[in-house]
């Protein structure tokens, strides 16, 4: 698995993820890029779960964003509907976080499209550790990127499926 986190604070939205790819109990790769910009570069997405499944879902989300430009919520809901009802997609094992300047969403294979509270959310094997760490840091004066990095570091210290090779994408919300 992996850990992906988003933090929305101080006019920034940050998504960060670690780089570990595991096959069973073996680390196969330590520098995978599981957080990236999609669409026209105005949406950031991160995934946890089976890599091939996640790429399939990212491609589908990009197509939905082409259908519904500038409407991340609508694109995410349409993807979740397809994911839940399509026989092939229903078997995909992945979760996604997506964010643009106005909204952050968690998308699951159960058809859930969730907008987090408190300015942060996390998914993956170390998601609960990262989420708790970020929540604890949200009331400090630390900027969004520092909170995301620190939360992932804490998750990587605890979760064997998360490493310290962190990739960060950032959007300016106020521009």
From Swiss-Prot:
Regulation: Allosterically activated by HslU binding.
Pfam family, one: Proteasome
Protein's job: Protease subunit of a proteasome-like degradation complex believed to be a general protein degrading machinery.
InterPro entries (alphabetical): ATP-dep_Prtase_HsIV_su, Ntn_hydrolases_N, Proteasome_sua/b, Proteasome_suB-type
Name under which the protein is recorded: ATP-dependent protease subunit HslV
Source organism, top-level taxon: Bacteria
Keywords: Allosteric enzyme, Cytoplasm, Hydrolase, Metal-binding, Protease, Sodium, Stress response, Threonine protease
GO biological process: proteolysis involved in protein catabolic process
Enzyme Commission designation: 3.4.25.2
Principal place of residence: cytoplasm
Family: Belongs to the peptidase T1B family. HslV subfamily.
Any single Gene Ontology cellular-component annotation: HslUV protease complex
Compartments, record wording: Cytoplasm
Complex formation: A double ring-shaped homohexamer of HslV is capped on each side by a ring-shaped HslU homohexamer. The assembly of the HslU/HslV complex is dependent on binding of ATP.
Catalysed transformations (reactions): ATP-dependent cleavage of peptide bonds with broad specificity
Binding site for Na(+): 156, 159, 162
UniProt-listed CDD domains: protease_HslV (cd01913)
């Amino acid at each position: 698995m992996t850990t992906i986190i988003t933090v929305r604070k101080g006019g920034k939205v940050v998504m960060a993820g670690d780089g570990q790819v595991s096959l069973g109990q073996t680390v196969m790769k330590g520098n995978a890029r599981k957080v990236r910009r999609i669409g026209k570069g105005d949406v950031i997405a991160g995934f946890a779960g089976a890599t091939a499944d996640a790429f399939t879902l990212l491609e589908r989300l990009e197509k939905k964003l082409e259908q519904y430009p500038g409407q991340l919520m609508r694109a995410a809901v349409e993807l979740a509907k397809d994911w839940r009802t399509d026989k092939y997609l229903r078997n995909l094992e992945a979760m996604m976080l997506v964010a643009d300047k106005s909204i952050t969403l968690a998308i699951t294979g159960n058809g859930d499209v969730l907008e987090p509270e408190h300015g942060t959310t996390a998914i993956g094997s170390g998601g609960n550790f990262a989420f708790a760490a970020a929540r604890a840091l949200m009331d400090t004066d630390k900027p969004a990127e520092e909170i995301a990095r620190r939360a992932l570091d804490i998750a990587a210290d605890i979760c064997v499926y998360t490493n310290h090779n962190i990739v960060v994408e950032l959007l300016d919300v106020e521009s």
